[in-house]
Swiss-Prot record:
Belongs to the adhesin P1 family. Residues 282-302 are annotated as: Disordered. This is Putative adhesin P1-like protein MPN_099. InterPro entries: Adhesin_P1_C. Transmembrane segments: none annotated. Residues 282-300 have a biased composition (Polar residues). Pfam families: Adhesin_P1_C (PF03257).
Length: 347
């Protein structure tokens, strides 16, 4: 779906067709002797071509230090970090809050606000990826076996990805996305206020944030949150696992054949399924899940056009210019536009 959270397609199947972890390993010694053996783009490169504009826009900014004896430094955005010592056969895709290790990453493509790259047997796509947004979504691999869910973690940050609502096309034909940033910030503000007035020394943290009601509205995989909670070791210390409800371990649905995968994606993109998911996401299907009252608003923020998101949600289609159907899109702003779905996918 256009504007969705990353769609991760796993090349699973029989042993002869499954992507093998051995296909992704590389040797640090080989890397030192022959850089071409590492199928990674260098920092600031897109498919092997250095593009200064893309480096500035997507990959980082250059800052000049106020100290006279210090040179200008580049603040990294998205790039690849090669290990400096022979103690780790891994490469890290770096940016504030994002890290993929230790898989072989290649074919990085930046197009508009979309970032796509191949990660082992996965195709990872970030849509509506805009640098100024505060908040990150990442895929972290802790092992070399891409088929082992225990070694693959999809990391959620409180914003903006956990609050994604959907995409539409504005009057200029540009794709826009609806985000409920206010909802997450309201949760944080409420927790901070409670902590400030509390007689205890407890501090509100991201781990105490409730799960956003639409965090998984567009996720085709399912989530096992219990597998990603912190556990207490015998010494009384908590291990390094993060127990934030925004950090989830994603277990892709098992796919036995490409036919099953094709059918599953067709079912996912079925208009009726999309309407149902959107109704649930916007809270317009009389769901039993409570919606924060403080987030409700009916302020139009975009001009009308021939098709509108409300008519799609209500089953009226995208072409009813004279339709008077209206759907309450609380707790987000009411918008007008066409819901766009991209049926193209790769595996």
């Amino acid at each position: 779906m256009l504007g969705s959270i990353p769609v991760l397609v796993n090349r699973s199947g029989s042993d002869s067709n499954k992507f093998q972890a051995t296909d992704q390993k590389w040797s640090y010694t080989d890397l030192q002797s022959d850089q071409t053996k590492l199928n990674l783009s260098a920092y600031g490169e897109v498919n092997g071509l250095l593009n200064p504009a893309l480096v500035e826009t997507y990959f980082g900014t250059t800052r000049t230090s106020s100290t006279a004896n210090q040179n200008s430094t580049t603040v990294p955005g998205i790039g690849f970090k090669i290990p400096e010592q022979n103690n780790d056969s891994k490469a890290t895709l770096i940016t504030p809050g994002l890290a993929w290790t230790p898989q072989d990453v290649g074919n990085l493509v930046v197009s508009g606000t979309t970032v796509s790259f191949q990660l082992g047997g996965w195709l990872v796509t970030f849509t509506d990826f805009v640098k100024p947004r505060a908040g990150y979504l990442g895929l972290q691999l802790s092992g070399l076996n891409a088929s082992d869910s225990d070694q693959r973690e999809l990391i959620w940050a409180p914003r903006p990805w956990a609050a994604f609502r959907g995409s539409w096309v504005n009057r200029l034909g540009r794709v826009e996305s609806v985000w409920d940033l206010k909802g997450v910030w309201a949760d944080q503000a409420q927790l901070a206020a409670q902590a400030a007035t509390s007689s205890t020394t407890t501090t509100a943290t991201g781990a105490t944030l409730p799960e956003h009601p639409n965090a998984l509205a567009y996720q085709i995989s399912y989530t096992d949150k219990d597998s990603y909670k912190a556990s207490t070791q015998g010494s009384g210390q908590t291990n390094s696992q993060n127990n934030s409800l925004y950090l989830h371990l994603i277990k892709p649905k098992k796919v036995e054949s490409t036919t099953q995968l094709d059918q599953g994606l067709k079912n996912l993109l079925d208009p009726n399924q999309v309407r149902t998911k959107l109704r649930q996401s916007f809270g317009t299907d009389h769901s039993t899940q409570p919606q924060p009252q403080s987030l409700k608003t009916t302020t139009p923020v975009f001009g009308a056009m021939s098709g509108n998101l409300g008519s799609v949600l209500s089953g009226g289609g995208a072409g009813g210019a004279g339709s008077t159907n209206s759907v309450d899109l609380s707790p987000v702003e009411r918008v007008s536009g066409s819901l766009t779905i991209n049926r193209n996918f790769s595996y």
